[in-house]
Amino acid sequence: MEEPFLPRDEQLVSCKSTWQSGQVTVELKKVSRLAAPMATVTIAQYLLPVISVMVAGHIGELELAGVALATSFTNVSGFSIMFGLVGALETLCGQAYGAEQYEKIGTYTYSAMASNIPICFIISILWIYIEKLLITLGQEPDISRVAGSYSLWLVPALFAHAIFLPLTRFLLAQGLVISLLYSAMTTLLFHIAVCWTLVFALGLGSNGAAIAISLSFWFYAVILSCHVRFFSSCEKTRGFVSNDFMSSIKQYFQYGVPSAGLICLEWWLFELLILCSGLLPNPKLETSVLSICLTIGTLHYVIPSGVAAAVSTRVSNKLGAGNPQVARVSVLAGLCLWLVESAFFSTLLFTCRNIIGYTFSNSKEVVDYVADISPLLCLSFILDGLTAVLNGVARGCGWQHIGALINVVAYYLVGAPVGVYLAFSREWNGKGLWCGVMVGSAVQATLLAIVTASMNWKEQAEKARKRIISTENGLV
């Protein structure tokens, strides 16, 4: 039976001793043991829709265009919201586990599911009319038809997200990441088989690719539900406290809404980037290259996001346990891992800059452009990794609202205007747009670093315990 990776600290550790190299080394090991499986889980989840897009691309150009458009639209209007909302559980479940309020972990998780499902109904209404909406916005009717049909079959997947995402945070808060790893990898293999069967063996076309996504995410939700229900590792935490249910829903939205803002504002900016690239002088080239850069950046981002999930878990656990010194060392450990991974992957990308474009295109023009913009992408790796880890700190502490406000300032008041100016007024084209993103990331990283460095960790620990133990007295 899997044991949690988060052993209890029997006593508070002095501030001086926590910063000694031995303590940092111990914390590095603990964070790494959480981060590596979570990065793999994130990759597996990310690959499900990617595989469906790849399979649809082998059907025809029309199907590829429609599926890509639907994937972009559903990510922005639905899946990003689900991913954002459950960030609240990284605060609530993690701190409840640290405070040994085990039954509240289950209550928070069930309240998240109950809150997500009505939101899914609202979003699904929008998805039903995607075809008409896209045509109204000037999209090609045939592409809009494929996108509309594909999105309709993704509605069940949206509801699956409402279930499995809270369960993922439920297990992560307890350090049960190996269960998540096995479940995610099993689901990935299941999806490959089901997608091929529905699309090619049964001839369902692009709709089959969407159905495969829905079936796979529900398969994932069922596996996680069975683990929570039947495994002894969750015996203490799967309970339900009915008296706390309504106050838990209020707390979920209190931290979930700014957490959704934290995630969605970033996701939406990159979709805006692709839209702006279509207005440049050579739209096909610019859109292709920026899409490739975005794909490379997203694939890299799963590594620091795994580190961020680990840091968020360690920070929330230790604050809930009243051990702010170790929580602070967890941040240092996360930053050390960020330095190592960003240096490695930036160097790797820069070394392979002249050939990596061939992974996505046979066009010499595209490959050369990707090589030209790769140094900027290397800098993005560094900045994105830092912001990911610091956002993990924000979720662990419960100040998602500050992170969301920083995102508005960094990306929409600074980054986006700079990118548009450089791309159109200075005629830097795609490079200018990407420079704008980098400026926004730099501002975001700077502001998050200032907030983190000036944080009173003892005060954060007191707030965490008050937040969890005094739920019945109202919101904190």
From Swiss-Prot:
The keyword ATP-binding does not apply. It is found in: Membrane. It is a multi-pass membrane protein. GO terms for biological process: xenobiotic detoxification by transmembrane export across the plasma membrane. Keywords: Membrane, Transmembrane, Transmembrane helix, Transport. This is Protein DETOXIFICATION 2. It comes from Arabidopsis thaliana (Mouse-ear cress). One of its GO terms (cellular component) is membrane. CDD domains: MATE_eukaryotic. Coiled coil: none annotated. The chain crosses the membrane at residues 34-56, 73-93, 117-137, 146-166, 184-204, 208-228, 260-280, 289-309, 331-351, 370-390, 402-422, 433-453. GO terms for molecular function: antiporter activity; xenobiotic transmembrane transporter activity. It comes from the Eukaryota. Pfam families: MatE. Its main location: membrane. InterPro entries: MATE_euk (IPR045069), MATE_fam (IPR002528).
